[in-house]
Amino acid sequence: MGVTKKPDLNDPVLRAKLAKGMGHNYYGEPAWPNDLLYIFPVVILGTIACNVGLAVLEPSMIGEPADPFATPLEILPEWYFFPVFQILRTVPNKLLGVLLMVSVPTGLLTVPFLENVNKFQNPFRRPVATTIFLIGTVVALWLGIGATLPIEKSLTLGLF
């Protein structure tokens, strides 16, 4: 057990800090040496032990052996590249496709400047940023799912 310091609520300085919403870390158990020397190494060693144990108990093959004479009909990238792959696949002009791919990080960089993020951290008080995030998430999922389908069904996801 560590040393637990109870707050003195009669202290006017602490009362002023608590009234402003500050001072919540003014008391409690210290991080040094309790957390840094005892808890963190146990968690890190436990994580390493779990990974090694799973690797020993259930070794898995990396994949099929490569066959240079058997090429799949359609080569798909890794799952995290599906939305970008779908953009390049559906846009007929490749320069426009590259510009659309560049516009994604550019748009993400402009989101903090649309609203004053430092003022509020609650997403319900930042409706523009929240709406852009939700629309971007839906579009990324739509493009990602569409990339796994044939090109004829990819834009409508086979629904229409």
From Swiss-Prot:
One of its GO terms (cellular component) is chloroplast thylakoid membrane. The keyword Transcription does not apply. One of its GO terms (molecular function) is electron transporter, transferring electrons within cytochrome b6/f complex of photosystem II activity. Pfam families: Cytochrom_B_C (PF00032). It comes from the Eukaryota. GO terms for biological process: photosynthetic electron transport chain. It is found in: Plastid, Chloroplast thylakoid membrane. The chain crosses the membrane at residues 36-56, 95-115, 131-151. The keyword Lyase does not apply. Keywords: Chloroplast, Electron transport, Membrane, Photosynthesis, Plastid, Thylakoid, Transmembrane, Transmembrane helix, Transport. It is a multi-pass membrane protein. Component of the cytochrome b6-f complex, which mediates electron transfer between photosystem II (PSII) and photosystem I (PSI), cyclic electron flow around PSI, and state transitions. The 4 large subunits of the cytochrome b6-f complex are cytochrome b6, subunit IV (17 kDa polypeptide, petD), cytochrome f and the Rieske protein, while the 4 small subunits are petG, petL, petM and petN. The complex functions as a dimer. Belongs to the cytochrome b family. PetD subfamily. This is Cytochrome b6-f complex subunit 4. It comes from Glycine max (Soybean). The lineage of its organism: Eukaryota, Viridiplantae, Streptophyta, Embryophyta, Tracheophyta. The gene is petD.
